[in-house]
Design a protein with these regions (language model features):
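Extracellular adhesion/carbohydrate-binding repeat motifs centered on closely spaced tryptophans
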Residues: 3, 8-268
């Protein structure tokens, strides 16, 4: 009887030890799983700034919030972008180091293929990056239609087939009109400055014939260079580019007389 009771005692003790070991394993496994879950759910306090040239992912989740300082964007996990470009609902924004959207003019490093530091313009109210032609404080500027950086210099702008050349100030970027003497570089390394004329109304570079301040001028096709000291058909463009009329000129050893329409009436 005693032996039987002792056997039952040890058998139960063995079972209890196994249960405790199993329970301990479950406890530690549960603790580890909880730790992993906790680590993966910890909200980030800051986001990485995209490197220049990195393509942005379009975000639609989150909430716009406006406070006394300005607008900022809050993600579902409570984090918010700062010191970086963001594409939200297909529009581009730049968030400053406090997380607020940038408005007006800002010099920044590009966010996609354009890696240079350039000027950008953000809507004064909404903060979205502007593209294409923009009238700002009475002046016209042109921003890349895809990446938004301000263009400078002589640029061909417009849809295929109707593109025209414009002169955007090399520093300020505002569209220029009227007369400008601009450089043209050739394949042999030579650079020559030519007079060109940009329409006072829409700023496009003029080609062909144009009457300016009462005088006729001719500008070459393709380059828009003012013709000078040269014949164009039956008309003669003087050194200053004006078409000869109502006068007699000595040209290559001969005297040419021009009527009021610029037609040669006599040669001596």
């Amino acid at each position: 009887m005693y032996a039987h009771t002792l056997l039952l005692f040890y058998e139960r003790r063995y079972q209890m030890n196994n249960i405790l070991k199993y329970s301990s394993k479950l406890f530690f496994l549960g603790l580890a799983a909880s730790t992993i879950a906790l680590a993966t759910n910890v909200p980030a306090t800051a986001e990485e700034t995209p490197q220049a040239g990195q393509e942005l992912v379009n975000r639609a989740d989150g909430q716009w919030i406006k406070d006394a300082t300005g607008w900022w964007f809050k993600y579902p996990d409570g984090t918010y972008p700062k010191n970086q470009w963001k594409q939200i609902n297909s529009r581009y924004y730049y968030f400053n180091n406090q997380g607020y959207i940038t408005t007006g003019w800002k010099q920044l490093t590009g966010f996609n293929k354009h890696k240079e530091v350039s000027w950008y313009y953000f809507d004064p109210t909404n903060g979205d990056m502007k593209t294409g032609w923009q009238a700002i404080n009475g002046k016209w500027y042109y921003f890349d239609p895809t990446e938004g950086y301000m263009l400078t210099g002589v640029k061909q702008i417009g849809a295929p087939g109707v593109r025209k050349y414009y002169y955007l100030h090399p520093t300020n970027g505002d569209m220029q009109t009227g007369w400008h003497k601009l450089p043209h570089s050739y394949a042999n390394g030579e650079t020559i400055y030519y007079w060109r004329y940009f329409d006072p109304e829409d700023g496009h570079r003029v080609e062909g014939w144009r009457k300016i301040d009462g005088d006729w001028y001719h500008f070459t096709r393709g380059m828009g260079v003012m013709s000078s000291s040269a014949w164009n058909g039956q008309y003669y463009l003087k050194e200053d580019g004006k078409m000869a009329h109502d006068e007699t000129l000595l040209i290559r050893g001969k005297y040419y007389t021009f009527n009021s329409d610029g037609i040669v009436t006599s040669v001596k």
